[in-house]
Amino acid sequence: MQTQEEMNVLVPEKLAEIERDYDVTVLWAIESGSRAWGFESPDSDFDVRFVYKHKQDFYLSLNDHRDVIELPIDDTWDVSGWDLDKALKLLYKSNPTLFEWLQSPIVYQQDSDFIDRIRPLVSQYFSEKKMLHHYLNTARTQMNKYLSGDKVKPKKYFYALRPILACRWIKNIILFHRFCLMIWSKNSSLMK
């Protein structure tokens, strides 16, 4: 298995290969999954996720096109990306996966202009209801799938706890922060 330091060199090479093979530009590439969450195991693969764009003519076509790039998965690599159009539509729908990608602590490649434009949209399209629904269902699925047997791998507990803690964070931190902003914007004397 490769180290993170080795992957910091190998991933940009893989992304350049994708750009050549698919005639796209990678705008944002990150690590997702257990490595981004801080609880990888020695046998964890690298979950590279990215957002890409095609040339303008691609978007002016009347034909439907595939909006994902997925490379074959092996013991080291799990690489997939979304077309910019798909990513923006999912952002509008408050898709938790894209929101998580934008918060990943491991960034392999980024277009600063893209990030400067998309980050402000996160708070605009963030839906507590959709996020809570997603994370509760994820927790339920993880618990039913991985925590019901006699022998449970410790890592599987993290996969069940993480979405529960995400719900708690959304309810306690995000909603409180929005509440404070609402009060402060309506009564600026509280800010003094």
Protein language model regions, located:
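Residue-level detector of short, conserved catalytic/binding motifs and their immediate flanks
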Residues: 27, 46, 158
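Catalytic metal-binding acidic patch
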Residues: 33-72, 77
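Conserved nucleotidyltransferase catalytic core and NTase-mimicking acidic/glycine-rich helix/loop elements
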Residues: 119-192
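Short loop/turn segments at secondary-structure transitions that flank enzyme active sites
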Residues: 52-58, 94-97, 141, 166
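A basic- and aromatic-enriched beta-loop-alpha substructure that forms the phosphate/nucleotide-
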Residues: 61-138
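A structural signal for short, well-ordered beta-strand segments and their strand-loop junctions
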Residues: 28-31, 100, 170-172, 176-177
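Helical scaffold of the NTase/Pol beta-like nucleotidyltransferase catalytic core
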Residues: 1-30
